[in-house]
Design a protein with these regions (language model features):
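Enriched for short, Lys/Arg-rich terminal
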Residues: 2-7, 11, 15, 22, ...
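N-terminal non-globular leader segments, chiefly Sec-dependent signal peptides
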Residues: 15, 23, 29-33
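Hydrophobic alpha-helical segments, especially transmembrane helices
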Residues: 22-24, 28, 42, 63
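A short, surface-exposed loop/turn module that caps and links secondary-structure elements
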Residues: 30-55
Length: 86
């Protein structure tokens, strides 16, 4: 799976704690090799992220993405569960 990042995602990722950034890199690398790996807990979202999906970065942090086509995912948001889904 090809991965691209929205500018907003890059800005949000830049504000993450160092250990979370490291975990993010690991999880997105895993996602690019195996998007349905059970560790990622990949799942579809509802309002306000209709037609988007989420993967777990840590127990607290999630990354939200949209599928552009069969082989490309656009990551749009990253943050804590409570911040993203309030």
């Amino acid at each position: 799976m090809n991965v691209v990042f929205h500018r907003r995602f890059e800005k949000m990722a830049g504000k993450l704690p160092a250990m979370t950034k490291k975990k993010m890199v690991e999880r997105i690398a895993l996602f690019s090799k195996d998007p349905l790996n059970s560790v990622l807990r990949n799942h579809a979202l509802h309002t306000p992220y209709k037609s988007s999906y989420s993967i777990d970065i840590t127990g607290e942090y999630r990354a939200v993405y949209e599928l552009i086509d069969d082989q490309t995912a656009l990551f749009t948001h990253i943050g804590t569960h409570s911040h993203l889904y309030k």
